[in-house]
Amino acid sequence: MSLNTKYDILDNRLVIQRLNAGDRQCFEACYRFYYKGLCSFASRWVSLPVAEDIVQDTMLYIWENRDRLMEELSLKGLLFMIVRNKSLDRISSQKVHSRVHQQLEKRFADQFD
């Protein structure tokens, strides 16, 4: 059964059942349906290229863990929650890298002058 209509994609129970069964067409339909919205959502916190990476990572995670998806959970809600958390993790990671870089610059500044 392919999911070609918006109505089909929004039928959470059907989508989860198809994903659990390993339906690649269903996954691709979900990917296409949610991609832009998820990228836009993630770009609230990170640049668009980073947002696109986060969305790809999220969709890969969903596919790799499809057998653990539960029909009672909203796929849309899950996707947006994962994207938000990954975006905030990326910000946190960037801050740590920036802080370490600044500390190293201060520590070794005299050696390079």
PLM features per residue range, with description:
Residues D8-N12, D89, H97-D113:
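Internal acidic/polar
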Residues A29-F33, R107:
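Alpha-helical structural segments
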